[in-house]
Swiss-Prot record:
One of its GO terms (molecular function) is protein dimerization activity. This is Glycine--tRNA ligase. It is found in: Cytoplasm. One of its GO terms (cellular component) is cytoplasm. Its main location: cytoplasm. It comes from Methanococcus maripaludis (strain DSM 14266 / JCM 13030 / NBRC 101832 / S2 / LL). Catalyzes the attachment of glycine to tRNA(Gly). It comes from the Archaea. Its EC number is 6.1.1.14. Substrate binds at R96, E162, F209, T210, Q211, A212, E213, E446, P447, S448, Y449, G450. One of its GO terms (biological process) is glycyl-tRNA aminoacylation. NCBIfam families: glyS_dimeric, PRK04173.1.
């Protein structure tokens, strides 16, 4: 067995991970978390919450997983949320084209076009792994799970492909909550869905998974000189830039360069200080939950693999024994793509008013509507026209005035309808105005975390074995069981003392497990396998002087302390 098989075997035996729907044969791309796995995953999530909600001042929202078609049409997911698909001509089995190539040829398919993937399959004579048949042409496959809202299927919808859209849709409400003062951040943690073509990587590639995403809204002019960056500028990280990825003269080791965030921004490797700051937050979080620093790197997306909404994106990749480097976190500059898209398609104003450092005088057009004529012409839509005219920027206003002067009419397109405006509908004149601020569409920095992949990597990076034991060396922040409590023997009042101590630990918010089964060595072994950092034994000495033996998992060191000092000692160590 390789390390992955050993970990999966342990996690199934000890209640971390189980195949979903197992008694019905199981379905690829779905896993259940057992009792300890659920605690481990929640500890990862709660550590993430600490970093983003407590430390960074973001607030959390919770929105539906079912998302109307028009929302994901506006966001670009209907057109762009796809993977390359190949289907066998004989057995009709489907596979991801890029994955099937990488399994047969030592080549990186990241960012390749459909045509390039097709040429690779033909050049290397790649056949169906199931029956040996030829493949059909490479095509695209939309990864969203389709559904409908209500009876009759009249309202098309999807299971959300990301949690982010729920935040963008509620932007006006979130902005009001923050008193419309940039910058501010919102997070959402929950299920997202990808109808993966052929998920064959266990817990690494799931069809239903948990995301933790933050959306940090900022004035685009503040990204270059980001106030918080000063606190992390000297942090050194292993960076795999887009430029180095494309430099064929460099070896794979030479392509990854360790440098400070300050130098990375100064040299134009990372786009700006704001995205660099959230790369640093990501590093801090991953270190706290026990990720091996030597198995972490940050890789920049190449231009041809960048998401449709992103201006720059860096993935935190974690190394795994079987699957190599896997993407676990994406830190992206989404610009104002999403807010603009939802403004255009919903008709709602998703701008924020920002005050200028200094007031200044400008010349601007002031419009006076002929309400009687406009009301008679557009009836109930007259108000829509009035509001739409107010939202026009200087350039659009110039276009309107020029068209009315030269052609006598202008067509104003809005999300609700097109308005043909005639010259007699309004009067436009230039006036001098004192400007104290302006409306802007904020840009978004998005740190997006795949919690299931991260949780698996926490387990793999914690997994250690030698001649006499197997250990899950979890960090104290995420270990599911904090303390094991054992009576040395099941007599002389030891079980009662041990049970009482276990209850005291739990009353103090610590998950403690009582175990009186088998030899003390086997009990230590069971606790080592589930990553419990401390074990406490009640023995004969306890009956004499009320002291107990504490054993530390990693060092195996044992020492005695008074029983009434156990709770404060453990809490201090954790």
């Amino acid at each position: 067995m390789d390390k992955y098989d050993k970990i999966i075997d342990l996690t199934k035996r000890r209640g971390f991970l189980w195949n979903s729907f197992e008694i019905y044969g199981g379905i690829a791309g779905f896993f259940d978390y057992g009792p300890l796995g659920a605690i481990l995953k929640n500890n990862v999530i709660n550590t993430w919450r600490k970093h983003y909600i407590v430390n960074e001042g973001f607030y959390e929202i919770d929105s539906p997983t079912v998302t109307p078609y028009e929302v994901l049409k506006a966001s670009g997911h209907v057109e762009n949320f796809t993977d390359p698909l190949v289907e066998c001509k004989d057995c009709l089995e489907s596979f991801r084209a890029d994955h099937i190539i990488e399994e047969n040829v030592d080549v990186d398919t990241e960012g390749k076009t459909l045509q390039e993937l097709q040429e690779m399959i033909e050049k290397n004579n790649i056949r169906c792994p199931k029956c040996g048949g030829e493949f059909k042409e490479v095509s695209t496959f939309n990864l969203m799970f389709a559904t409908s809202i209500g009876p009759g299927g009249k309202r098309a919808a999807f299971m959300r492909p990301e949690t982010a859209q729920g935040i963008f849709i509620q932007f006006k409400r979130i902005s009001q909550f923050f008193r419309n003062k940039l910058p501010f951040g919102a997070v959402q943690i929950g299920k997202a869905y990808r109808n993966e073509i052929s998920p064959r990587q266990g817990v690494i590639r799931l069809r239903e998974f948990t995301q933790a995403e933050g959306e940090f809204f900022i004035d685009s002019r503040k990204k270059e000189n980001f106030e918080k960056f000063e606190s992390v500028k000297d942090m050194v990280l292993p960076l795999l830039s887009g430029k180095n990825q494309e430099d064929e003269s460099l070896s794979s080791e030479e392509k990854v360069v360790k440098m400070s965030l300050s130098d990375a921004v100064k040299n134009g490797i990372i786009a700006h200080e704001a995205i660099a700051y959230y790369i640093a937050v990501t590093k801090k979080f991953l270190m706290e939950i026990g990720i091996d620093e030597t198995k972490l790197r940050f890789r920049q997306h190449l231009p041809n693999e960048m998401a449709h909404y992103a201006a720059d994106c860096w993935d935190a990749e974690l190394y795994t024994d079987r699957y190599g480097w896997i993407e676990c976190v994406g830190v992206a500059d989404r610009t104002n793509y999403d807010l603009l898209a939802h403004m255009k398609n919903s008709g709602d104003d998703l701008s924020v008013f920002v005050e200028l450092d200094e007031e200044h005088e400008i010349e601007a057009y002031e419009i006076e509507l002929n309400y009687k004529l406009v009301g008679r012409t557009f009836k109930g839509d007259a108000k829509v026209l009035e509001e739409s005219l107010k939202e026009l920027d200087d350039k659009k206003m110039e276009e309107l005035v020029e068209a009315l002067e030269t052609e006598g009419k202008y067509v104003l397109k809005t999300c609700k309808r097109d308005f043909e405006i005639l010259k007699e509908y309004l009067t436009a004149k230039k006036v001098k105005k004192i400007v104290k601020g302006e409306k802007i569409i904020p840009h978004v920095i998005e740190p997006s975390y795949g919690i299931d992949r991260i949780t698996y990597c926490v387990m793999e990076h914690a997994f250690k074995e030698d001649e006499d034991r197997t250990v899950m060396g979890f960090s104290n922040a995420v270990s599911p069981i904090k303390v094991g409590v054992f009576p040395l023997v099941n007599k002389e009042g030891m079980p009662e003392i041990a049970m009482d101590l276990k209850n005291k630990l739990r009353e103090n918010g610590l998950i403690a497990e009582y175990d009186d089964s088998g030899a003390i060595g086997r009990r230590y072994m069971r606790m080592d396998e589930v990553g419990t950092p401390f074990c406490i034994t009640i023995d004969g000495e306890t009956l004499k002087d009320r002291s107990v033996t504490i054993r530390e998992r990693d060092s195996r060191e044992q020492f005695r302390i008074p029983i009434n000092e156990v709770v404060p000692y453990i809490k201090d160590k954790l």
